[in-house]
UniProtKB/Swiss-Prot annotation:
This is 96 kDa cell wall protein. It comes from the Eukaryota. GO terms for cellular component: extracellular region. It is found in: Secreted, Cell wall. Its main location: secreted. Keywords: Cell wall, Secreted.
Amino acid sequence: AVREYHWFVE
């Protein structure tokens, strides 16, 4: 559920 944070952290 926390994996969706990759798009803004890339």
